[in-house]
A protein has these predicted regions:
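Aromatic- and Gly/Pro-enriched helix-to-coil junctions and flexible linker segments
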Residues: 28-157
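N-terminal non-cleavable signal-anchor helices
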Residues: 19-21, 26, 131, 311, ...
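Generic N-terminal helix/loop capping motif
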Residues: 23, 80, 103, 107, ...
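Predominantly soluble domains enriched in secretory-pathway, periplasmic, or organellar proteins
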Residues: 119-121, 141-486
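A detector of low-complexity, intrinsically disordered, Ser/Thr/Gly/Pro/Ala-rich segments
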Residues: 1-4, 8, 88, 219, ...
Length: 486
């Protein structure tokens, strides 16, 4: 009679064992990482499998570890576009300018290879994975919903940097400062060296000229698309100035027998070329008066500026103004700019390390203001009443109070500062530091597809007249000119 009880107990024990086994098997299945859902960061699925699972990991580029990993957080598509301490890592449509691609790539036939290879101290990505990332970037690096970063707001505040070593214009977000797009400029395979960039007075367009080119090019600021170009013949087109109504431009050819090209910016047609061989010598900087009737052009290799009456811009008259009657070193006037009210104009004199100030009505010298070594470009803040002057050899920006006509501070900004631009909305000044091999400046973080040595951006806080602490953003090769679109 005991046998049935024993069998019943065995049956019960067996059922319990099966239940435990099923529970254990179920737990193992739940622990399988291949089955676990994960936060894809709103990357496309195939991209998320690579970036989220292999890059945005503990000890590397996730939110918790980013400070020890160059400040780069790859946890989400949005945080990726904040970049790292050196700037943007992903530039939509440009894997050839994206360090995210450089540092995962191990095959030079696919593009740039940089060290150390990422993921750090782990097996490198397969070629298929590298191609997935490269092709995704070249398609605009869209998110999980197909959206392209920075394409949502045609009125976005931005600033532009012309990188003359690569024929690239960097389009920077005014909030994060990162490069949103790289625009190839020029119309020839050879490097044409974009030397100056300017946003139109109404903020609708930007223009660029070249020291080894034959055009001025026009682009829309809403989407940075090419609009048109005006043929102005081959020359060393260094600088240009735009009338206050945005309809006309004068472009200067820096050559021994220099020229000025007068262009209608609405039709993008060359209307006239001003020249006087043997007399109009090495012109460089230029500025048009607020009323649009007087054009000033500096003659960089001497003591002269040229004053043109362009009331009739097709048949102008000009005169020569001597700006240094004190003897000694030549003034070598580089650039010229009007005060906000138009009553004065300022001339950087690189040969004498000073800014000279003149009365617009009489062209009489008002003041000679000492600067740091080799003053070049200028940008004015009407709100602060400051004139900011890059001094390339002095590695500084000299700040001049335009109400008292005195220098108030020299700010060390970086190696070989050249272009700069005031951003009134942000109370900042953007400074492009060329950082060429002869400068003694810091080695760049990386080398891009065009080779050469990258420059970098620093920022002055206009409230404190100090650099923004810890900010140094890598640019492309030989950044030369900056312009703001507010």
């Amino acid at each position: 009679m005991q046998i049935p009880r024993i069998l019943k107990s065995i049956r019960l024990a067996g059922r319990a064992g099966v239940a435990v086994l099923l529970l254990f098997v179920g737990a193992c299945k739940d622990d399988d990482p291949k089955q676990e859902p994960f936060n894809d960061g709103c990357y496309p699925p195939k991209v998320a499998e690579i970036i989220v699972k292999k890059c945005a990991t503990a000890g590397c580029h996730n939110t918790q570890s980013k400070d020890a990993a160059s400040g780069l957080d790859l946890s989400t598509w949005e945080t990726m576009f904040l970049g790292n301490r050196n700037g943007a890592v992903t530039v939509p449509y440009r894997s050839d300018q994206s360090t995210l691609f450089y540092f995962i790539n191990t095959d030079t036939t696919l593009g740039i290879v940089q060290q150390p290879t990422m993921p750090y101290n782990l097996a490198p990505l397969t070629q298929a994975e590298v191609l997935t990332i490269r092709n995704w970037i070249d398609a605009g690096a869209p998110n999980c919903n197909g959206q392209i970063k920075f394409a949502d707001n045609p009125n976005r505040k931005k600033f532009y940097v012309a990188n003359q070593g690569c024929d690239l214009v960097g389009v920077h977000d005014a909030v994060t400062k990162v490069v949103m797009r790289y625009i190839e400029v020029g119309n020839k395979p050879a490097i044409e060296s974009p030397h100056m960039i300017k946003v139109s007075p109404d903020g609708q367009f930007w223009y660029v000229v070249f020291i080894n080119g034959d055009v001025i090019q026009k682009y829309r600021t809403s989407d940075d698309a090419f609009v048109a170009e005006a043929q102005i013949s081959q020359g060393a087109w260094n600088t240009f100035t735009i009338s206050s109504d945005g309809t006309r431009a004068w472009i200067v050819d820096f050559s021994s027998t220099g020229r000025v090209a007068y262009v209608n910016l609405q039709s993008m047609q060359l209307e006239q070329t001003y020249s006087d061989p043997g007399f109009f010598n090495s012109p460089h900087g230029c500025a048009i008066s607020p009323d649009g009737n007087t054009l000033y052009v500096t003659a960089q290799l001497g003591n002269t500026i040229y004053k043109w009456d362009v009331t009739d811009p097709v048949s102008p008259d000009y005169e020569e103004i001597i700006i240094n009657n004190s003897g000694g070193l030549n003034a070598e006037p580089h650039e010229i700019a009007f005060s906000p009210d138009g009553s004065k104009y300022f001339v950087t004199c690189q040969g004498r390390d000073e800014v000279r100030v003149f009365d617009s009505a009489t062209d009489a010298l008002i003041a000679a203001i000492p600067t740091a070594d080799f003053p070049l470009e200028m940008s004015i803040s009407p709100a602060k009443n400051y004139l900011f002057v890059t001094c390339e050899i002095g590695n500084s920006v000299t700040v001049i109070d335009i109400s008292t006509l005195t220098a108030v501070k020299d700010i060390f900004v970086g190696f070989q500062p050249h272009g700069l631009a005031v951003d009134e909305a942000k109370n900042q000044v953007y400074v492009a530091n060329r950082n060429t091999p002869s400068s003694g400046g810091p080695p760049p973080h990386h080398t891009s597809s065009c080779g050469g040595r990258n420059g970098y951006l620093t920022i002055i806080n206009m409230n404190t007249l100090n650099l923004v602490n810890g900010f140094k953003m890598e640019l492309s090769v030989d950044p030369y000119s900056v312009s703001v679109r507010n």
